[in-house]
Amino acid sequence: MTFQIVFQHPDFIVINKPNGISVHKDDADVGLTRLVAQQLGVPQVWLVHRLDKVTSGLLILALNEKAAMTLSRKFAEHQIQKTYLALATQKPKKKQGRISGDMLKARRGAWKLCQSKENPAITDFVSHSLAPNLRLFILYPKTGKTHQIRVAMKSLGSPILGDELYGGEVADRTYLHAYQLSFDYFGEVVQISSSPEFQERQKCGDFFQRFWHDIEKHLHSENEKTL
């Protein structure tokens, strides 16, 4: 397997991880970090954050131990701005705003959102209609909890399309994509965005393929609001 490298720096790279690929070593598989190291022809790369197996999109891998410590700290201290895209078929309780609450383990490897806010998962979002019974969510997680966005979407009454663990409709993939990362790296402003891998339809997903032009228009509109 060859991974798409969307950004390369002397200290780190950013790949576009396909959905269905675990960042951890599965029992029968070679781990993602080993595969990327082999692709680059280097002894090792370092994982500094994680994406769920079902999530596609931007994943940073450090190329040396010092960079790994720096980037891991930035993620831990919420110094890296993240933007995710999700699709859902069910109408949300609200169309934009903030989802906040503590997260507790539930059954079958799932998590649930609680009303308490001692150490809350925080996600800001806006949404736009793409078609009847299909809605785009642009999400800005302010924390980095396990399954945070998937749980937030379920709490809105709009589980992610394809995310059966949280009640989403069956689809060809889970429609959650890590679209953009923005951060300062020793005075260098790094901002990276990447679409799903359109050249491989199975990895991208049919709905991202069909509606990407409309999705890009909404992303452009949201970016203009922040300027």
Regions found by a protein language model. Give the residues of each.
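Pseudouridine synthases involved in rRNA/tRNA modification
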Residues: 1-3, 7, 11, 18-22, ...
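Residue-level signal for inorganic ion chemistry
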Residues: 16-17, 60, 86, 125, ...
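Glycine- and acidic-residue-rich catalytic/RNA-contacting loop of pseudouridine synthases
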Residues: 21-34, 70, 87-135, 151, ...
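A short alpha->loop->secondary-structure connector
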Residues: 31-32, 75-82
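Glycine/acidic-rich beta-strand-loop module
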Residues: 42-77
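Short hydrophobic/aromatic beta-strand micro-patches
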Residues: 61-63, 87-89, 140
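Short, solvent-exposed secondary-structure boundary/capping segments
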Residues: 133-139, 204
